[in-house]
């Protein structure tokens, strides 16, 4: 109580921040009259004037009032829109690297222009991040009018652009694009072989629109570039049939809250027996160690059938399983579930099963956006997640006041016992609203529920529009016209829709939709005037009816999504109303103990069709939602700790890779690698302080043959009186250096430098790809360490570091081995440019695409493991060429590199297969 009184007297921290911005607003308003009288040319000259001030040492904060006033005047002249004072404050919040929470309809898109223009004056580039291509194109064209008028260049990154177009867009002062495109371009750039081929500039400043959707809802989902792995289509089909025909109710246990399902003991026995019958299981125990892969695929088939529902979690479109985003209801084209789950869903639905893939590069949005020195964001709903924004991203949230008071009436929830009673009440309300010409927006949590409600309305002959992932293309137009008199619009989650619902209808959308074929001229002007009059008249009708009525058919597990739905009504001081209709059969109610409530309602004598309405129920639901939000925050925080381990390693690898590309030559690096490999080779065979008879000269001789490609008299050297390991290291080093000097003399220094650089990059990429796979495997089982009273995170850090050191050692060895064996044919006058890796861009898991590993031009140096490099015969003929490897003759395999696939065809690395015996 006293806290509330104190806040009323002195204001909270947010109020004080907003109050502090008003002084700057007054300064900007004082400049406005001076700019009104300027000609367009004079106003445009202010951009150069502001840049000159920056060049002379002033800061962005110093020029902020003049820059904001300039943008405001330019917006009036180009768009016919003037920034309100609260919008100016929103621009200041963005400029200082914070998140501005602004209600729907407060003009977030226009607010961004202020901070974007100011920061773009430095010439380092500003990125504006949106949630889909439509908004990126719309905003870059719409707001781009302001920037171009003021002499700044604008680029737009959308799907389907080639590298030249992307490079030009990133070179612009301001670049609009989606979070996916920015992230994938970063990963692709770090797979390029020349700096000139990269498309992005160094990061400077990013403003993220719908920041809660991108940095929280999608934070757990990594961006992945991948290439194909083994084909297991027949296994998925077989296991799908086993689960479909064998597993019945009672054979499995399901935990909806944890989204987990597992076989019971009886179910396990039935599945194991069926697997033996079809020959997939050789023994009666499904959980034997050698059946671990089979168990994994059985579990994924079980999840596909018992946890994932068509038209709720995914839809089937064009012979593909397409994931539906649980927060926005959008189709996530190109995104796939990981670890074989997507293939299990494809088998379940009978569509073409795409091959599993191996990760080539990946990053989460959490770590991608933390690469920007300055980051800001905008959204209508961020305060509920303010703690997470601060803890993970260091981004404070400022709740901006509205330009006009909010007049929307948020009514208490109505709770019914069954879903049928709930839908009957919703339809009654819709009919009442239509009778008074009040538009209704109905929010559902899934496609299935939206189509169910649509069927009810069809039976009642109520005209309506349905907006869900199936009709993505018409999305913007349907939303824009949802404010017309009597309109009924059913929409899956409204998060991130990006288009305002304007009462009476949306002028721009109607012009675009109805007059697209009408050329400029008097006839078009008359048609526009007619549409404008129709919208004005329609708005009056809607205002008298009470504005837009928002109906929620279920509570989402996140309060933020519910608030976004409510926020569609009551924009810019318009009247409106909102109400949620719930039933005890809803997911959130069922998961959080609706059985007890059902018993209580029956005792109270609640009749069919009656609802219980009380603020206590609202509070109880909000508490349940708060618990879920806290749980999800903990999951994201924990995942980030693990991803940070890989992120630190990623930074090192990408930085080293860029240094290699930037260097004129890498001779010193490969020489250093060669010397380290020789030292390690000798140290393994001749341990420190060991007696001569303890030296493993046979092993050393074989390693010298394999790595250096020469039959050197190592055993004879070891027998020499008084020889030490340092002497052997020196002789091997001298031999290797002389051999490389001979190659340089034969092929020329320029060609050798190109070969060294090309090989180092290619082998680094291959090693990094293998390392990512190893980290994936490590991550999957690391939580089991908790049973041994060990901290899984510390274990993961320790072992991941060990794997990283192993990767670097393997990199040094492979680079040395390949360079010692390399022969350049005379036809190779010019070394071809290394091929760019080809990979599928996916969310969460790989999708099918050719790997591109075989796409090297003829004449490119190749290696015997059929990857990128193949040694030609060395010197006077010690090493056989790759073509002499015979699959059935293990004796011919002895010079196969240790990390290459074994020639026997097992799929294992040579060092883990036939290479073990050496």
Swiss-Prot record:
One of its GO terms (biological process) is protein targeting. It is a peripheral membrane protein. Transmembrane segments: none annotated. It catalyses: ATP + H2O + cellular proteinSide 1 = ADP + phosphate + cellular proteinSide 2. Residues 908-918 have a biased composition (Basic residues). May bind 1 zinc ion per subunit. Residues 876-918 are annotated as: Disordered. Signal peptide: none annotated. SMART domains: SecA_DEAD (SM00957), SecA_PP_bind (SM00958). The keyword Transport applies. Its EC number is 7.4.2.8. Keywords: ATP-binding, Cell inner membrane, Cell membrane, Cytoplasm, Membrane, Metal-binding, Nucleotide-binding, Protein transport, Translocase, Translocation, Transport, Zinc. GO terms for molecular function: ATP binding; metal ion binding; protein-exporting ATPase activity. One of its GO terms (cellular component) is cell envelope Sec protein transport complex. It is found in: Cell inner membrane; Cytoplasm. ATP binds at residues 87, 105-109, 500. Its cofactor is Zn(2+). It comes from the Bacteria. Gene3D superfamilies: 3.10.450.50, Helical scaffold and wing domains of SecA (1.10.3060.10), P-loop containing nucleotide triphosphate hydrolases (3.40.50.300), SecA, preprotein cross-linking domain (3.90.1440.10). Zn(2+) binds at residues 902, 904, 913-914. Belongs to the SecA family. Part of the Sec protein translocase complex. Interacts with the SecYEG preprotein conducting channel. Has a central role in coupling the hydrolysis of ATP to the transfer of proteins into and across the cell membrane, serving both as a receptor for the preprotein-SecB complex and as an ATP-driven molecular motor driving the stepwise translocation of polypeptide chains across the membrane. Monomer and homodimer. Part of the essential Sec protein translocation apparatus which comprises SecA, SecYEG and auxiliary proteins SecDF-YajC and YidC. This is Protein translocase subunit SecA. It comes from Rhodospirillum centenum (strain ATCC 51521 / SW). The gene is secA.
């Amino acid at each position: 109580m006293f806290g509330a009184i104190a806040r009323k007297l002195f204001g909270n921290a947010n109020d004080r921040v907003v109050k502090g911005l008003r002084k700057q607003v007054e300064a900007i308003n004082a400049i406005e009259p001076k700019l009104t009288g300027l000609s367009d040319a004079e106003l445009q000259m202010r951009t150069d004037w502001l840049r000159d001030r920056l060049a002379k040492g002033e800061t962005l904060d110093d020029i902020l009032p003049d820059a904001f006033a300039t943008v405001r005047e330019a917006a009036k002249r180009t768009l016919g829109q003037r920034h309100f004072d609260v919008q100016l404050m929103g621009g200041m919040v963005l400029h200082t690297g914070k998140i501005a929470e602004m209600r729907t309809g407060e003009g977030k898109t226009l607010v961004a222009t202020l901070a974007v223009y100011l920061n773009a004056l430095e010439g380092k580039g500003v990125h504006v991040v949106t949630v889909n291509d439509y908004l990126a194109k719309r905003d870059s064209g719409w707001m781009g009018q302001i920037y171009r008028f003021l002499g700044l260049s604008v680029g737009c990154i959308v799907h389907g652009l080639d590298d030249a177009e992307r490079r030009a867009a990133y070179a612009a002062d301001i670049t609009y694009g989606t979070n996916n495109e920015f992230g994938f371009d970063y990963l692709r750039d770090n797979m390029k072989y020349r700096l000139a081929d990269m498309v992005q500039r160094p990061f400077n400043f990013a403003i993220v629109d719908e920041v809660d959707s991108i940095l929280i809802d999608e934070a757990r989902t990594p961006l992945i570039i991948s290439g194909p792995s083994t084909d297991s289509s027949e296994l998925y089909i077989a296991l799908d049939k086993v689960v479909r025909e064998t597993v019945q109710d009672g054979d499995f246990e399901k935990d909806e809250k944890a989204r987990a399902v597992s076989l019971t003991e009886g179910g396990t026995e039935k599945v194991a027996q069926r697997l033996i019958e079809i020959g997939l299981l050789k023994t009666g125990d499904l959980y034997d160690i050698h059946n671990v892969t089979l168990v994994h695929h059985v579990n994924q088939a079980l999840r596909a059938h018992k946890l994932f529902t068509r038209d709720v979690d995914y839809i089937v479109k064009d012979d593909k399983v397409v994931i539906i985003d649980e927060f926005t209801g959008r189709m996530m084209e190109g995104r796939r579930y990981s670890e074989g789950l997507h293939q299990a869903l494809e088998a379940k639905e009978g569509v073409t099963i795409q091959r599993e893939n191996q990760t080539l590069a990946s990053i989460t949005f959490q770590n991608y956006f933390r690469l920007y020195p300055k980051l800001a964001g905008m959204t209508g709903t961020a305060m509920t997640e303010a703690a997470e924004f601060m803890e993970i991203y260091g981004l404070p949230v400022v709740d901006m006041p509205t330009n006009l008071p909010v007049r929307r009436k948020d009514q208490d929830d109505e709770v019914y016992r069954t879903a049928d009673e709930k839908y009957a009440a919703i339809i009654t309300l819709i009919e009442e609203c239509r009778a008074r010409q009040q538009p209704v927006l109905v929010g559902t949590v899934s496609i299935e529920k939206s189509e169910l409600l649509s069927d009810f309305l069809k039976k009642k002959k109520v005209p309506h529009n349905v907006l869900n992932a199936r009709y993505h293309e018409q999305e913007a137009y349907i939303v824009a016209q949802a404010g017309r008199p009597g309109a009924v619009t059913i929409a899956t989650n409204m998060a991130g829709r990006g288009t305002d619902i304007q009462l009476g209808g949306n002028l721009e959308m109607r012009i675009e939709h109805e007059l697209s074929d009408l050329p400029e001229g008097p006839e078009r002007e008359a048609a526009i005037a007619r549409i404008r009059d129709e919208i004005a008249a329609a708005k009056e009708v809607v205002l008298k009816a009470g504005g837009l009525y928002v109906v929620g058919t279920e509570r989402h597990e996140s309060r933020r999504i519910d608030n976004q739905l409510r926020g569609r009504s009551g924009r810019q001081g318009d009247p409106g109303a909102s109400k949620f209709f719930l039933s005890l059969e809803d997911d959130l109610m069922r998961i959080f103990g609706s059985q007890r409530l059902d018993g209580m309602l029956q005792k109270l004598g609640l009749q069919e069709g009656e609802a219980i309405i009380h603020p206590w129920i609202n509070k109880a639901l909000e508490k349940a939602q708060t618990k879920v939000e806290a749980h999800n925050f903990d999951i994201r925080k924990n995942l980030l700790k693990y991803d940070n381990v890989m992120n630190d390693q990623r930074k090192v690898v990408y930085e080293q890779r860029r240094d290699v590309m930037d260097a004129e030559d890498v001779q010193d690096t490969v020489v250093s690698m060669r010397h380290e490999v020789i030292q390690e080779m000798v140290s393994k065979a001749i341990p420190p302080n060991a007696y001569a008879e303890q030296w493993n000269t046979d092993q050393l001789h074989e390693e010298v043959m394999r790595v250096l490609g020469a039959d050197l008299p190592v055993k004879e050297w070891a027998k020499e009186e008084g020889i030490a390991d340092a002497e052997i290291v020196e002789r091997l080093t001298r031999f290797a250096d002389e051999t490389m000097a001979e190659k340089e003399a034969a092929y020329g220094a320029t060609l050798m430098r190109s070969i060294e650089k090309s090989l180092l990059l290619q082998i680094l990429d291959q090693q990094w790809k293998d390392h990512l796979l190893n980290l994936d495997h490590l991550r999957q089982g690391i939580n089991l360490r908790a049973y041994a009273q060990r901290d899984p995170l510390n274990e993961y850090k320790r072992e991941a570091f060990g794997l990283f050191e192993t990767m670097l050692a393997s990199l040094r060895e492979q680079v040395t081995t390949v360079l010692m064996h390399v022969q350049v044919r005379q036809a190779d006058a010019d070394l071809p440019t290394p091929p760019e890796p080809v990979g599928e861009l996916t969310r969460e898991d790989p999708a099918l695409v050719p790997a591109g590993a075989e796409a090297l031009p003829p004449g490119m140096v190749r290696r015997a493991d059929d990857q990128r490099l193949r040694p030609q015969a060395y010197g006077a003929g010690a090493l056989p060429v790759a073509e002499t490897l015979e699959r059935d003759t293990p004796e011919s395999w002895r010079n196969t590199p240790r990390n290459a696939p074994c020639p026997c065809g097992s799929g294992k690395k040579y060092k883990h297969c036939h290479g073990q015996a050496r």
